[in-house]
C-alpha cells in the first residue's frame, strides 16, 4: 500500500511538472548516501548559490533547463532507512546521478553495495549513471581512479557510466557532470 502511494505521488509530480513545462521532462534520479551533498548540488544548480540544507527526509524535486533539456531532478534522501524507498522513484528515470562523498573512504563499501543494487533493478536496466565525486575541495578527497577502483565501476558493461570529480561549494565539476548527462541523453 505504501509502495503504491509513493509510485502514485512520483507520477503525479512528474505529470504536474510536464504540464507547466509544455514538453516532456527528462527524469533524473539523484541519490547517494546521507551527507554526500545531493541537496547542496541540486540547489547550487537551481539557484546558483550554496544553500544551507538539512538532511532530506523524503525528497526534493526541481526542474532545471540545461543544454536544451528540461530535467526534473529528484533528490531522494540517503539515510539508511530511507534507501528502501528509492525503488519508488525508479519508474520513468532517464539517468541516475549518484553523489559520493569522496572524503568518506570508510563508506565506499556501502556506496558500492547501493550501486550494485541499482544495477540489478529491471526498471533501471541500461540507464546511464553519473557518479559525482563530491567534496573535491577537501584535502583527503579520493581521486577519480580511486573512486572507480573502490566501486569496481570498470565491471559495468551494460550501460554508460562516468565519474566526475566536483565540489558543490566551489561549483567545480558540476556543470561538466551535467554536460555528460545532457550529451548522453541527447545522443540516445
Curated annotation (Swiss-Prot):
Superkingdom: Eukaryota
Key word Transport present: yes
Keywords tagged on the record: ER-Golgi transport, Golgi apparatus, GTP-binding, Nucleotide-binding, Protein transport, Transport
SMART domains to which the protein is assigned, alphabetical: ARF (SM00177), RAB (SM00175), SAR (SM00178)
One Gene Ontology molecular-function label: GTP binding
Entry keyword annotation includes GTP-binding: yes
Main location: Golgi
PANTHER family reported for this sequence: ADP RIBOSYLATION FACTOR-RELATED
Protein name per UniProt: ADP-ribosylation factor K
Organism, as annotated: Dictyostelium discoideum (Social amoeba)
